[in-house]
Amino acid sequence: IKAIHEKERAAEQRRWEIERREREQQRQLQRKKDAEDFIANKSKFFGLVITDEEIIVKVLESIDEYYNEGKTQGICVFGSGYYKKADTLILSARIGDEIIETVEVDLRTLEVVQCHGKHNQDTEYHERIIDLVNKNANLIRERMKAA
């Protein structure tokens, strides 16, 4: 009886391992598809920089940048899959290398939907960043037309 039980347990463990590998393979395929979709949807905006000489607002250009922005700022920009949203452009407002606020622009209206600093708190630069992005919405529009 013990041998039968061990044999059944070994078979069950093999089945679990096969299922685990299949799930991991599916996750890898999904990550690859997400990356390809991201490039297809957002690459036209890569290199776009808006500045007022002190604040630099740049497009997040990779899924890793979304992850790092979310982790650094304590926000859900990566966890909520903003890189998958076709009608959303995410920008990072910085002074030097420091992230000040993260900006979400609706690509249908070219309006700022959200703009927040660390842990979704607004900074002293909040209104200035929103004004800077809104005043330069034409740069986003030009990239959309050129694609």
Give the positions of each predicted feature.
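Catalytic-core elements of nucleic-acid end-processing and repair enzymes
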Residues: I1-A147
